Amino acid sequence: MKVIKHLTLFLLLTVTVNAQNIMTSSPYSMFGIGEIVTGLYGSNSAMGGVSTGMRGTWLLNTENPAGLTGLDTLRLFAETSAFMKSESYQSKNGNSNAFTGNMSAFTLAGRIMPHWYMAAGLTPYSSVGYYFQSTEPLEGSPGSYYTSTFEGYGGLSKVYLTNAFMLGKNLSVGVNVSYIFGNTKLTESQSSISVENRMYTHAFYADFGLQYHRQIGKETAFTIGDVYGYKQRLSIENSIAIVYSSSETEESKRNTTQYLPQFAGIGGSLTYKKCTYALDYDFHQYSSLSSGDSRVKFRDSHKLRLGFDYSPNGYSSSSFWKRSSYKAGVNLSTPYLQINGQKGYAYRFSAGMGLPVTNGRINVALYYDKTQLNNDVYGQSTFGMTVTYTLSELFYKLKL
């Protein structure tokens, strides 16, 4: 238990320090509550992030909290994730490139009592991170120009407590109770003056999950599940600061209204011999968010996720490669941003491996992400990697 204890203390400190760090470089993260963070953590990142119908003895599935009941009943788990990615942005106003990386999540999970499982953790919810400059002619002074600098950083983090219960041999339910919080700062600077828009956001939230799992013979099992989260108003405190070269004036602004969007999803997985196939469908009502700019609107998003896992011989094999697992996945979705009336499409391809290590597993995923709006209004291409380390230690000497 000492390994889990020391790792937990270190990672909680590390992830807390990094919770507000930049996880995106998109200029459109300035709108709403920032860019929604997805696909940057979890051992199933290589499978396209499928989760609704997924469960396993080493799978810390809090996306569908009911899936937590599939964990090994004798073990305590600690899991942390990190990522790095190279992003490229294209629009009619120009192109830009950026590289980002960070710790992205931490989870601690295990069984508390027979039929009762719990998890606690910290993950990012949204991120703001951009920097660009604009040069315009100075009115009334032909041949003269002024430069404006736009910069923003911050975002929202989610700390959560998950409870999952087995209602019978095949049926499980779960709930995530979360506190979402964070600060963002958006700055526009010209010469010796800058204007900072500051926003502090927080809210309590809950989402729910259900799974039905059934074993058919020795080599076949299937799981179906669904998830739901309601629309929740965010508490927001706005202020504006005007900063001169040697002074600063701050005053409160009229508070804006933003919401955590309602979402629902359904999914399933089928395990036959050494292979697992999974399919998820998700709906997020992002249209409840406000951008504050008439040119940029949020629209509802639909996402289809497919995942595949091949595990040759599981944990019992003496061969390292046969104890490894091989994963791939694909996402197809409608982007939640609409710019100048233009909609578009998004897709993601991912592949990776789950590697056995002493007292744990390391899951590595490589992915390519593409978002494109019509008429080349906006495009984003991302190539990245996520690494998730799951550590496990025996918690009970005897099964309860």
Task: Briefly describe each language-model feature range.
Residues K2-K5, K327:
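Basic side chains
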Residues I4-V15:
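Sec-dependent N-terminal signal peptides
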Residues Q20-L400:
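Subset of outer-membrane beta-barrel
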